[in-house]
Curated annotation (Swiss-Prot):
It comes from Streptococcus pyogenes serotype M1. The lineage of its organism: Bacteria, Bacillati, Bacillota, Bacilli, Lactobacillales. InterPro entries: C69_dipept_A-like (IPR047804), Peptidase_C69 (IPR005322). Pfam families: Peptidase_C69. GO terms for biological process: proteolysis. Belongs to the peptidase C69 family. This is Probable dipeptidase B. PANTHER family: LD30995P, SECERNIN. One of its GO terms (molecular function) is dipeptidase activity. The gene is pepDB. Its EC number is 3.4.13.19. Gene3D superfamilies: Penicillin V Acylase, Chain A.
Amino acid sequence: MINKKISLGVLSILTAFSLQSVSYACTGFIIGKDLTKDGSLLYGRTEDLEPHHNKNFIVRLAKDNPAGEKWKDLSNGFEYPLPEHSYRYSAIPDVTPNKGVYDEAGFNEFGVSMSATVSASANDAIQKIDPYVKNGLAESSMTSVILPSVKTAREGVALIAKIVTEKGAAEGNIVTLADKDGIWYMEILSGHQYVAIKFPDDKYAVFPNTFYLGHVDFNDKENTIASEDVEKVAKKAKSYTEVDGKFHIAKSYNPPLNDANRSRSFSGIKSLDPDSKVTYKDSNYELLQSTDKTFSLEDAMKLQRNRFEGLDLKPLDQMALDGKGKPKSKKAVKGYAYPISNPNVMEAHIFQLKKDIPAELGGVMWLSIGSPRNAPYLPYLGNISRTYEAYQEKSTQYNDKSWYWTVSHINDLVAAHPKPFGTKVIDEMKGLEKTWIAEQDKSTKEISDLVVSDPKAAQEKADKISLDRAEKTFKRLKAIEAKLVKEKPKNKKGLNRS
């Protein structure tokens, strides 16, 4: 997410040691269907900003729009005409729309799924030639404008391209859209430049906040959508770079790789493929990664929970600080880095798409509202029309009826007291997920069969299953929260430590 800063403690560490105090945000991934054990396409993202930032999970119902009505982004002034009819879609919005809606991810009623965005930024030379447009298309509007307007993933990419061409982009972003025919990966590079590719089925990718596209065949119109002046702008900026005699997009548009992007690229690739030849010292990481391994949904969850397990790195948030929240010395920083699973993750989602799931369902979104570090991923089919009430609490401070705030509190308690609480919570969450994965295959098949003959009954069944599971899980999370509060260590005066 652009303009979404990491927590002050971590930011002060990065600033003090020149590790580049820029916006650190989401980490995305894609695993092509040829690389999964069950033939699923897997993709998703962690959404990062800061601790204690509420996220909701809702369904925006289909509606007719009056002629001339526009979408208006209160955070930057962007406007765009609404379609005559907006399609139903699920969303994961912020609760402060005046600062941006940030619908982030979901399915629409035609089975198009979308995750938007992973923020990135062009180098200074590029921005001087094709600067970002203040009231252009931003992450805050992306999902809200695209998902209710398109019937295929390619249509979604084409609509983004049209908007960026006509109105400009407010920021650099990486967007992923998918449907039953596959997934598109799109980089919005500068004010009016973009490139999108149909992602190969036999590759995987991990992408934090920098651009990754290398050489792209612009003549392959079936699998590529690109602005006309991508190369021209790079040449005019004098940042045009070739690799093996061919134009390289990332090397032409990126600033130097910073440490937070390096650590997440490296650890993400190694999480999926420990035998990968990438190193922590690589100057850049390619988007399209190859392997002879196959992956499961659990591997994707493990990736989003990664905190450098098995690597010679330690999470930055575990560093000992002085009384002012700063590192005790430069030497104390050595060996610490910014992980994918960090204190600023507000939610994480994984889309699981299978060829035999009807377009009316789209697939399954596995969703953790709140960081999945000590919280579960719950499955949601793309045809749901309602979400559990605890997902809809809009408070900007702790609220005991809120899913996000309950999970946030659990994460805070476990992080503050790792010795007594250990891995008890996450171990239970993984046990629940294992059960749900087995159950979901069965219910997805049943609802897939039903949707052909009776779409309304299929939707009602999907709603009931997901609502019942969410209610039961939330009650368990409240019990865990209460137990942790009761059992947390007390200070010398006998008071509970937060």
